Amino acid sequence: MNRKSRILKMLTKTGLVVLAIVFCYPVLFLLTGSFMGQSELSENLGSVMGEATRYARWNFLPQNPTLKHYIEVLLDSPEYFVMFWNSIKVVMGTLVGQCTIAIPAAWGFAVYKFKFKKSLFFLYIIIMMMPFQVTMLSNYLILKQLKLLDTLASLIFPGIFSTFPVFIMFNFFRGIPPAVIEAARIDGAREWDIFLKIGIPLGKGGIIASLVLEFLEYWNLIEQPMTFLNDKTKWPLSLFLPAIRGENVGFAFAVSVITLIPAALVFFAGHEYLEQGIASLGVKE
């Protein structure tokens, strides 16, 4: 490796470290703020909270660490746990439904040939690219006709038929060598057995990657529950933080940290499969 290459490699690593610090800063900000007392937060963020005119400042080591905000969230906020279990129900219901619908759909697109296959898959891609604001009205009217508004099913039902997990899993299933499938057919394996014993084991990377991504998406729903739910007892955890009053900064920090933990655990548990899923997103026909 010549001198120019070493310098370029060093600059690249330095740039990546700087980016990592920038992206980690909000997490460190939340974590340290959650252990600060209200007086210290007011002193540091007085200008942001409208209590002072000087510039805001921040200390990464709390002067007087306290667990007060965590105790308040975990022991004095029953509505937090109601919303937490609402989020669990929504996420688990959506993921189970997606496994039931998306895995066979992705396998069908990847393995079988049928009329209008490319056109139908192209339609899937178009729907996947549409933001929620485009489909919001149609979803609302359908859910109203089905009498699902103001229920957790109004969040679960549209998510079950999401096209995104189909797209992720399709790219993994498509990577299975056709010779393997043909050999199984020659040996007398039924199509269902091929799907269960070859497709799912070899495509588990795509399945797990899509489940991780969908967990992160539905754990952080904002617009859908605000649109489809009027009963606040049905709200998911993602709407708890916006409902906190501005002066309860420490409480908001603690809520943010606790809410972040499940998402972080899921991400780190499936990050290897997630990397494989992102690498497989190139569409080939």
What spans do the regions from the language model cover?
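A structural signal for multi-pass alpha-helical bundles of membrane permease subunits
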Residues: N2-E285
